Amino acid sequence: MAQQILVLHGPNLNLLGSREPHLYGSLTLAQINQGLETLAAQLGVGLTAWQSNHEGALVERIQAARQDGTDFIIINAAAYTHTSVAVRDALAAVAIPFIEVHLSNLYKREPFRQHSYLSDLAVGLVCGLGADGYEAAVRYAARH
């Protein structure tokens, strides 16, 4: 059972609530994180949420997870899902189980968004469920 969950949010997710709400919903990132923190507390696990627009910063945070007691990672790498071998390699290097989450259904989007550099390494993929997808991932992580 995971005791400490790290939730990573990639580029442009800091704009949630105002960025294309028809795709990503009307909740802000702060509201999503607050809901996840509340859920984690109810489940008896720790949760840290972190966001960056910068690929290198995400890689460094993934690497830091190796030393900070993180048992499980939930990641929405956003655009880096489709472009970043560096994020993939960092996740592979730390060998911490992770779930890939996307607010929108990647398979109803442009063809370039339908490829993920992360999915084959992930324990699972949740997409198209909006903020509920993060909650499903937290529930799973808390049990494994």
Swiss-Prot record:
Keyword RNA-binding listed: no
Broad enzyme group: lyase
Reactions this protein catalyses: 3-dehydroquinate = 3-dehydroshikimate + H2O
Keyword line: Amino-acid biosynthesis, Aromatic amino acid biosynthesis, Lyase
Pfam family, one: DHquinase_II
Enzyme Commission number: 4.2.1.10
Pathway involvement of the protein, from the record: Metabolic intermediate biosynthesis; chorismate biosynthesis; chorismate from D-erythrose 4-phosphate and phosphoenolpyruvate: step 3/7
Residue positions of the active site: Y24 (proton acceptor), H102 (proton donor)
InterPro entries: DHquinase_II (IPR001874), DHquinase_II_CS (IPR018509), DHquinase_II_sf (IPR036441)
UniProt site (Transition state stabilizer): R19
Example GO BP: amino acid biosynthetic process
Molecular-function GO term, any one: 3-dehydroquinate dehydratase activity
Keyword Amino-acid biosynthesis: yes
Subunit structure: Homododecamer.
Function: Catalyzes a trans-dehydration via an enolate intermediate.
NCBIfam families found in the cross-reference section: aroQ, PRK05395.1-1, PRK05395.1-2, PRK05395.1-3, PRK05395.1-4
Name of the protein in question: 3-dehydroquinate dehydratase
Species per Swiss-Prot/TrEMBL record: Bordetella petrii (strain ATCC BAA-461 / DSM 12804 / CCUG 43448)
